[in-house]
């Protein structure tokens, strides 16, 4: 089960039923994932189990187009790692974190920390004992990297020098 996305106004989470192969095959865990064959159901956030004691996932952070999706695929193929490429729920958490200290914030800082711990527990689960999960975060998620990794998580950050990055962006589609 993947906690796919949140409806903050209703305090619901869309849970998608995925097999391990679905995670491996998905380029990204975004809206394109929700085809007709994927079972899904909206659930109250508080009705979902708290897996805060589950292992935290490892992370790949990146800025721009630097091969992070390829790195995620290679790690998953070379090991028994479960790849989670750009889960949408993390994007929602980053948006909440951006406004957490402002009066218009939808969550209090305490609720943000609680929901973050729940989300990390959900994303850290594997399909069998000992299987690690690795999240390839989207670029905007890098803003909450400290919140996601804590003091004991494993993470890598991918980037390219600015001149090479500019060349790549200006070159357009290959």
Stretches found by the model and what they are:
Residues 120, 124-147:
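Glycine-rich phosphate-binding loop used to anchor ATP phosphates in small-molecule kinases
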């Amino acid at each position: 089960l993947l906690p796919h996305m949140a409806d903050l106004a209703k305090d619901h989470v869309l849970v998608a039923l995925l097999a391990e192969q679905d995670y491996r095959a998905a380029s990204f865990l975004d809206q394109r994932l929700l085809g007709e064959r994927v079972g899904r159901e909206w659930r109250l956030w508080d009705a979902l189990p708290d897996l805060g004691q589950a292992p935290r996932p490892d992370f790949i952070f990146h800025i721009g187009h630097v091969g992070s999706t390829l790195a995620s695929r290679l790690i998953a193929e070379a090991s028994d790692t479960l790849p989670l490429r750009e889960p949408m729920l993390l994007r929602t958490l980053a948006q909440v974190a951006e406004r957490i200290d402002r009066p218009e914030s939808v969550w209090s800082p305490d609720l943000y920390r609680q929901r973050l711990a729940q989300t990390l527990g959900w994303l850290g689960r594997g399909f069998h004992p000992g299987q690690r999960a690795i999240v390839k975060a989207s670029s905007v998620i890098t803003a909450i990297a400290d919140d996601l990794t804590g003091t004991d998580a494993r993470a890598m950050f991918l980037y390219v020098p600015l001149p090479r990055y500019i060349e790549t962006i200006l070159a357009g589609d290959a």
